[in-house]
């Protein structure tokens, strides 16, 4: 019993969060949702920022807004289940989320709407490779990676 109690204390002190939450989701942006008030950051992916623009065939489009709205459409009125094992520095649960039997994180990357966030996970690299090869979503044109966009990098002007 003493050994079990010690292990439990060590586990709790380690900061590991194991969560399985389900419910209606509110979409904050392309890779962040909230379920029952808990903010959830989709694991292993990064999407364009809400105000980010991309270019396809010389036409600039609001890719960040479009990705957010696409995710909202996928999740709207659906039961979303998220499985997470840790929180980020903003207190968001880092999780893989599922709706209608598919992995939302994987689908965003496969459709070319998100990038595999290699800095934190290698999980969705195969989906990104397929999206890039098929020139789906972001891969059909020009874009700045979300992590570079956050650092101030922008597309070169298209003259």
Outline where the language-model segments fall.
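Small beta-barrel nucleic-acid-binding modules, primarily SNase/OB-fold domains
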Residues: 3-5, 15-159
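Sec-dependent N-terminal signal peptides
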Residues: 6-10
């Amino acid at each position: 019993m003493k050994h079990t109690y010690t292990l439990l204390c060590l586990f709790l002190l380690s900061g590991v969060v194991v969560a399985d939450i389900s419910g209606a989701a509110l979409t904050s942006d392309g890779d962040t949702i909230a379920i029952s008030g808990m903010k959830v950051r989709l694991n292993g992916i990064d999407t364009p920022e809400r105000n980010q623009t991309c270019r396809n065939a010389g036409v600039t489009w609001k890719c960040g807004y479009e990705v957010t709205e696409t995710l909202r459409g996928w999740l709207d009125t659906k039961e979303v289940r998220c499985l997470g094992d840790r929180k980020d520095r903003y207190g968001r649960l880092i999780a893989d989320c599922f709706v209608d039997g598919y992995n939302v994180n994987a689908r965003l990357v496969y459709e070319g709407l998100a990038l595999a966030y290699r800095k934190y996970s290698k999980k969705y690299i195969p989906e990104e490779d397929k999206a890039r090869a098929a020139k789906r979503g972001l891969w059909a044109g020009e874009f700045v990676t979300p992590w570079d966009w956050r650092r101030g990098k922008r597309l070169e002007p298209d003259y």
